[in-house]
């Protein structure tokens, strides 16, 4: 279990629309909020995500 910016499979962030709390909870986390991730912009930060849910890997660009 860890905290982090939840990632799409291409190492792209989920933007904060409509909100992050539901997205994080639907993926097994305890909740979430909007944050700013340098190089990605406004993104969803999740608390206590399971290890099998991807989080943003620093230094790897979004390749969508």
Curated annotation (Swiss-Prot):
One of its GO terms (cellular component) is extracellular region. InterPro entries: LCN-type_CS_alpha_beta_dom, Scorpion_toxin-like, Scorpion_toxin-like_sf, Scorpion_toxinL/defensin. Residues 2-63 form the LCN-type CS-alpha/beta domain. Pfam families: Toxin_3. Signal peptide: none annotated. The modification Lysine amide is found at residue 64. Disulfide bonds join 12-62, 16-34, 20-44, 24-46. It comes from the Eukaryota. It is found in: Secreted. Keywords: Amidation, Disulfide bond, Ion channel impairing toxin, Neurotoxin, Secreted, Toxin, Voltage-gated sodium channel impairing toxin. GO terms for molecular function: sodium channel inhibitor activity; toxin activity. GO terms for biological process: defense response. Belongs to the long (4 C-C) scorpion toxin superfamily. Sodium channel inhibitor family. Alpha subfamily. Alpha toxins bind voltage-independently at site-3 of sodium channels (Nav) and inhibit the inactivation of the activated channels, thereby blocking neuronal transmission. This toxin is highly toxic to insects and mice, and inhibits the binding of alpha-toxin to cockroach neuronal membranes. This is Alpha-like toxin Lqh6. It comes from Leiurus hebraeus. The lineage of its organism: Eukaryota, Metazoa, Ecdysozoa, Arthropoda, Chelicerata.
